[in-house]
Design a protein with these regions (language model features):
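Charged, terminal alpha-helix-loop-beta segments
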Residues: 1-197
């Protein structure tokens, strides 16, 4: 198998893509009526809105409204780049199938709720007995200008020595290097500390 060739979509991926397209076409309140990004269709000979990519001016509407401001602040204060925005890496992608966006929309609101994170993790890993504060976000809790004073139990865009271990150009969280979308730091029933990638 050649991993560099585009792989066929799974049934789930196809269903999700069609669902996102339906939401965009119907001007769903989920995306607050955002328009699709324009792209040129050669065989049609004109520019048409994308059925699954929100235009760059409205790309923040790809984030759930209830977490939008906090997620944007989290990325800015932690100097995390957004995936897929070549012009401005400080705004989220408009791609409605982005794993980065999906992780934030589903998990960001839980990040400070230790019990909720534990319950979520134990559905798959019942031997996890404690969720620990994130070591990469913990340092920011003590900064005067950092708005989140409670520990974070879910972290986003984790990297670790990418230059050395993966021979990549950078170690920066987010775009342009290999990152784990989400990770949780925990302790299992054997008292071992574990990193759980999501």
């Amino acid at each position: 198998m050649n991993y560099f060739e585009k792989q066929p979509q799974t049934k789930f991926q196809s269903q999700q893509e069609e669902y996102q397209k339906q939401l965009m076409r119907s001007k769903s309140p989920i995306f607050e009526g955002a328009e699709g990004e324009l792209y040129y269709i050669e065989n049609v000979g004109r520019w048409l809105p994308s059925p699954k990519i929100i235009n760059r001016r409205e790309s923040t509407k790809n984030l759930y409204k209830g977490i939008r401001h906090a997620a944007l602040s989290y990325f800015q204060l932690n100097d995390i780049e957004w995936w897929g925005q070549s012009e401005n890496l400080y705004f989220p992608t408009g791609h409605t199938l982005s794993s980065q966006i999906h992780c934030l929309n589903h998990l960001f609101a839980l990040r400070a709720d230790k019990d909720a994170v534990l319950a979520l993790i134990q559905t798959l890993l019942p031997n996890i007995c404690e969720i620990l504060p994130s070591p990469i976000d913990e340092k920011f809790c003590h900064m005067d200008n950092y708005p989140y004073k409670t520990p974070s139990y879910i972290s986003f865009e984790f990297t670790c020595e990418n230059r050395t271990l993966l021979n990549e150009r950078c170690n920066k969280r987010g775009a342009n290097c290999t990152s784990i979308d989400v990770f949780v730091y925990a302790k299992d029933s054997d008292n071992k500390h574990v990193l759980i990638p999501i």
